[in-house]
UniProtKB/Swiss-Prot annotation:
Name of the protein in its database record: Elongation factor 1-alpha
GO molecular function terms listed in the Swiss-Prot or TrEMBL record: GTP binding; GTPase activity; translation elongation factor activity
Gene3D superfamilies recorded: P-loop containing nucleotide triphosphate hydrolases (3.40.50.300), Translation factors (2.40.30.10)
Subcellular location: Cytoplasm
Residues annotated to bind GTP: 14-21, 91-95, 153-156
Protein family per UniProt: Belongs to the TRAFAC class translation factor GTPase superfamily. Classic translation factor GTPase family. EF-Tu/EF-1A subfamily.
Modification sites for N,N,N-trimethylglycine: 2
Pfam families in UniProt: GTP-eEF1A_C, GTP_EFTU, GTP_EFTU_D2
Residues modified to N6,N6,N6-trimethyllysine: 79
Record domain tr-type G: where: 5-240
In-chain residues carrying the UniProt-annotated modification N6,N6-dimethyllysine: 3, 316
Gene (name only): TEF
NCBIfam families membership: EF-1_alpha, PRK12317.1
Classification of source organism: Eukaryota, Fungi, Dikarya, Ascomycota, Saccharomycotina
Amino acid sequence: MGKEKTHVNVVVIGHVDSGKSTTTGHLIYKCGGIDKRTIEKFEKEAAELGKGSFKYAWVLDKLKAERERGITIDIALWKFETPKYHVTVIDAPGHRDFIKNMITGTSQADCAILIIAGGVGEFEAGISKDGQTREHALLAYTLGVKQLIVAINKMDSVKWDESRYQEIVKETSNFIKKVGYNPKTVPFVPISGWNGDNMIEATTNAPWYKGWEKETKAGAVKGKTLLEAIDAIEPPVRPTDKALRLPLQDVYKIGGIGTVPVGRVETGVIKPGMVVTFAPSGVTTEVKSVEMHHEQLEEGVPGDNVGFNVKNVSVKEIRRGNVCGDSKNDPPKAAESFNATVIVLNHPGQISAGYSPVLDCHTAHIACKFDELLEKNDRRTGKKLEDSPKFLKAGDAAMVKFVPSKPMCVEAFTDYPPLGRFAVRDMRQTVAVGVIKSVVKSDKAGKVTKAAQKAGKK
């Protein structure tokens, strides 16, 4: 077997008709987790429905339909392999809650793949002012997805024309530069998702195409296909050296064992014997054991979904949205208030001080008041445009002071990224996204269990 491949998460963004499903479907189909039986079943259904052209989008449509009906699909279906990586496709936009998922994300993307439709008229529509493409790319950048790959799709529809390709590369470079990416670090790859051309094997339809190139700290990296571009993602650094932050997804009471909180380690490590504090309540206790997939662990590291058993704490004292940390190393605390840069996406009216929508931050889901609108900024550069604006509307970026309606635990994005980004939800949609700059923490002490006191004396 050799060493486990590194896991990377990618998010696929782009305009509705850019061919995201077909392209993703193709990678999963050729390199991925869909077993032959499932594919044969899909192919048979496709043929019966007269969708003989089947082509990979059908795979993805099936998966999506199942997911939207709330059938949890075997997530293995959304995975594929490159020589270096296990790749998980987090979520393709178009899905209603895409923005929310990307922020509270069960997993942060290491790289975004922007799919641009090269067809005549299509490219222009996808990248126009109101385009979703702009919003998705801006979101990815704002939320700290620092690596980008651009795939220029549907090259078959323009007969692999070189000048059309160059024109799109030029326009797209300007576009991603405005969002904040440096085009020199971004591979541009011409593909046809429908025909599977230049996805896994180099195309033979474009004698002019010499391959993509990107700059990295280690020097220039070159390749031809989309799969090679994904394989050339720089390996993500997982934050094991930071203090522990583990937002709880659920808390179970298990007969004979006791209270078992469950969640994903975002930063740091959790080990048996550790004395942990839960914020915002401040309850401090000892971790008896840590397990994942019913196996005992010596330690849980970032990315692990773990369950852990705690002593002398009842299910009533801790809940989903609480954050677990090491009581001796920068323990998490309740936030009295916090300042954040907010980008208003789609709010029909004006937002003024006093507005109290629900914020989704890690696993917490709590109403927070826009207490003060401190300053309005340029979305791209962050430069200040005006002090104390009276209101904000769609498209604005601003620094805002928030006050939670009940105790919650959040962190500055620079300290603990997964706990420092949030979605603002109202009217059943994401109206804004935010990145937390600073937090005023509460110093109220909470309950310390006997187990914690004993462990502390050891």
